[in-house]
Amino acid sequence: MNKTIMALAIMMASFAANASVLPETPVPFKSGTGAIDNDTVYIGLGSAGTAWYKLDTQAKDKKWTALAAFPGGPREQATSAFIDGNLYVFGGIGKNSEGLTQVFNDVHKYNPKTNSWVKLMSHAPMGMAGHVTFVHNGKAYVTGGVNQNIFNGYFEDLNEAGKDSTAIDKINAHYFDKKAEDYFFNKFLLSFDPSTQQWSYAGESPWYGTAGAAVVNKGDKTWLINGEAKPGLRTDAVFELDFTGNNLKWNKLDPVSSPDGVAGGFAGISNDSLIFAGGAGFKGSRENYQNGKNYAHEGLKKSYSTDIHLWHNGKWDKSGELSQGRAYGVSLPWNNSLLIIGGETAGGKAVTDSVLISVKDNKVTVQN
């Protein structure tokens, strides 16, 4: 009898350890966006095209349900946030009416009650791609991202070049062979008020803008971790935005993922521990750049980090590893943990699984 009970206990523990965090996404999912509201997860765009899905994490039979398609066309690098029961989607990269790749600065709103989308008559004062979005006191805040004019111009040139490989090589060399400050990544902080649909200036980084940073916020503090300083060159910087009191303060924490940094990483909080995991970058690019090579990642292979770092006692500690390196998925707060949905692995392969990272007593637990 005791042996039978013990065997059942082992089987149940094994099943729990191997149980998937969430069901696989309906399609391999990367470069999209997502948000969570009342334990219901919403994901869409990126490699899912115009599709959006939701999943009730508290349901007994968890499954992804297709929602109304996004009306703005396929997008990558859009961001999203829930405010007062509605889902807002900001910008992204996609095709315009002429078929040219461009950065958008528009806003769409999804109403879960009616399963319907509407494009708002509101445009950010700059393009939104590679940016981050977070919510504070009922407003959405946006910072970072590529320069709309420079990025759009690059893709216009590529379109003109067609299949002319010589022209394409020349365009790429011209585009990548510049210093970081010459790309004018967005270092402004913008606020969006959903009640008025108006954009406002909310501040400005005393350092520089990034693209593809990881973002997480709790209470009056928001952290921006790593990202690109220019196309192909990452930064290991960590910025903290402190909304405590009447004046926004920008602080710089110790770097992480040094020396090269990563973009497309994942950030979250578990039991008050700040987590940073994964991301992709080019090892050796920082040294190349410091040695005067502006096209810093030329000839380098993109690598995907498995590292999990915790911010503890004023410094970053590597505290665990993902089962495989990944980047460019969605990271959300769930069950007092960091939930990662999808992403891409080596070679840019989009994946369908989810990962849950939890911290207790500064010890990391990873559930796949």
Curated annotation (Swiss-Prot):
Its main location: periplasm. It is an enzyme of class 5 (isomerase). The keyword rRNA processing does not apply. InterPro entries: Kelch-typ_b-propeller, NANM, NanM_proteobact. It catalyses: N-acetyl-alpha-neuraminate = N-acetyl-beta-neuraminate. Kelch repeats lie at residues 40-84, 86-137, 139-173, 174-219, 222-265, 287-336, 338-367. GO terms for cellular component: periplasmic space. Keywords: Carbohydrate metabolism, Isomerase, Kelch repeat, Periplasm, Repeat, Signal. Gene3D superfamilies: Kelch-type beta propeller. It is found in: Periplasm. Homodimer. Belongs to the NanM family. Converts alpha-N-acetylneuranimic acid (Neu5Ac) to the beta-anomer, accelerating the equilibrium between the alpha- and beta-anomers. Probably facilitates sialidase-negative bacteria to compete successfully for limited amounts of extracellular Neu5Ac, which is likely taken up in the beta-anomer. In addition, the rapid removal of sialic acid from solution might be advantageous to the bacterium to damp down host responses. This is N-acetylneuraminate epimerase. It comes from Shigella flexneri.
